[in-house]
């Protein structure tokens, strides 16, 4: 489902002494089946923005269009139930979303809540657990017995159990070690590529953004500053420096080499893959020179 924000403002506690405008004239487009990252400093409006995607928040003005549904300030809660099945939300530290006595019961909760029979929910729980790389042995275990990485997988399985078209993730790898982060991000990318799930990632890890996102929305003080490819965002040092956005370590290394005369012949590499491709071209050119 395509996502459109048109002139969206959001105000917390309007018409009170504590009124605060969190989003200002937000216009953006997220293509169906794409992998979009949302970045920005703390307080830039990231969390407020993603809460509009399943109607947890409604625009103070403007509209959010998701598929055929248009969300405005006047939309009724009864009109949002189908949307909330189609848009899965995984918040920061998703293990805090685990509440049932067993992994199976936790994953079954969503499908049953949306009207699925207990028998079918059991089948869905097994399928969802398999998708996140865990076997049936985990079904009868307490979520509290699991490691941090396993808890993240179970929480993700619970969201996937309702078969969302859109998956919104708020810092899904926060607190995990390097291996755990890689496993979770590869799993999320796999969902996008194999099941055509639209992925919307909020992250402070610019490495994750550079490695996995196809496009980036940069927010500052509730406004969209730029929407572009990761390469265009991270190669624009004027914007990243002004807004205090860290660049990926690969780009930092590339900038260091650029200052010392290395010609990258175009945009700077932003991740390990693009840097390795650059090195490969250099070696191929040297081989040709030797042959000549």
UniProtKB/Swiss-Prot annotation:
Report the top EC class in one word: translocase
* Superkingdom, taxonomy of origin: Bacteria
Q: Where does ATP bind?
A: 40-47
Q: Which SMART domains match?
A: AAA
List the keywords (alphabetical). ATP-binding, Cell membrane, Membrane, Nucleotide-binding, Translocase, Transport
PROSITE patterns according to UniProt: ABC_TRANSPORTER_1, ABC_TRANSPORTER_2, CBIO
User: Where does this polypeptide localize?
Assistant: Cell membrane
Topology versus the membrane, per the UniProt entry? Peripheral membrane protein
Using the UniProt record, give the first listed, main subcellular location: membrane
Could you tell me which residue ranges the ABC transporter domain spans? 3-246
Cross-referenced InterPro entries, in alphabetical order?
Answer: AAA+_ATPase (IPR003593), ABC_transporter-like_ATP-bd (IPR003439), ABC_transporter-like_CS (IPR017871), ABC_transpr_CbiO/EcfA_su (IPR015856), ECF_ABC_transporter_ATP-bd (IPR050095), EcfA2 (IPR030946), P-loop_NTPase (IPR027417)
- GO molecular function terms here? ATP binding; ATP hydrolysis activity; ATPase-coupled transmembrane transporter activity
Question: What is the purpose of this protein?
Answer: ATP-binding (A) component of a common energy-coupling factor (ECF) ABC-transporter complex. Unlike classic ABC transporters this ECF transporter provides the energy necessary to transport a number of different substrates.
This protein is called what?
A: Energy-coupling factor transporter ATP-binding protein EcfA2
Instruction: State the gene name recorded for this protein.
Output: ecfA2
């Amino acid at each position: 489902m395509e996502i459109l924000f048109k002139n969206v403002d959001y105000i917390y506690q309007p018409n009170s002494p504590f009124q605060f405008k969190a989003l200002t004239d937000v216009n953006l487009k997220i293509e169906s089946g794409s992998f979009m990252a949302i970045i920005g400093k703390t307080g830039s409006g990231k969390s407020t923005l993603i809460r509009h995607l399943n109607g947890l928040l409604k625009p103070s003005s403007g509209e959010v269009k998701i598929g055929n549904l248009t969300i405005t300030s006047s939309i009724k809660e009864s009109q949002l139930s189908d949307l909330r099945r189609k848009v899965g939300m995984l918040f920061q530290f998703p293990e805090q979303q685990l509440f049932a006595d067993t992994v199976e019961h936790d994953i079954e909760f969503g499908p049953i809540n949306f009207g699925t029979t207990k028998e079918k929910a059991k089948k869905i729980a097994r399928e969802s657990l398999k998708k996140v790389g865990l076997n049936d042995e985990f079904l009868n275990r307490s979520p509290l017995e699991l490691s941090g990485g396993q808890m993240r997988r179970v929480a993700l399985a619970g969201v996937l159990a309702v078969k969302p078209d859109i998956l919104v993730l708020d810092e899904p790898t926060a607190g995990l070690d390097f291996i755990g982060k890689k496993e979770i991000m590869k799993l999320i990318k796999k969902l996008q590529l194999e099941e055509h799930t639209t992925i919307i990632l909020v992250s402070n890890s610019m490495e994750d953004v550079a490695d996995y996102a196809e496009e980036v929305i940069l927010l500052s003080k509730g406004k969209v500053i730029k929407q572009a490819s990761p390469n265009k965002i991270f190669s624009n040092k004027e914007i990243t420096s002004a807004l205090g956005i860290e660049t990926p370590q690969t780009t930092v290394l590339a900038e260091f080499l650029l200052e010392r005369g290395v010609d990258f012949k175009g945009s700077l590499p932003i991740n390990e893959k693009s840097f390795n491709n650059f090195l490969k071209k250099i070696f191929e050119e040297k081989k040709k020179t030797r042959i000549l």
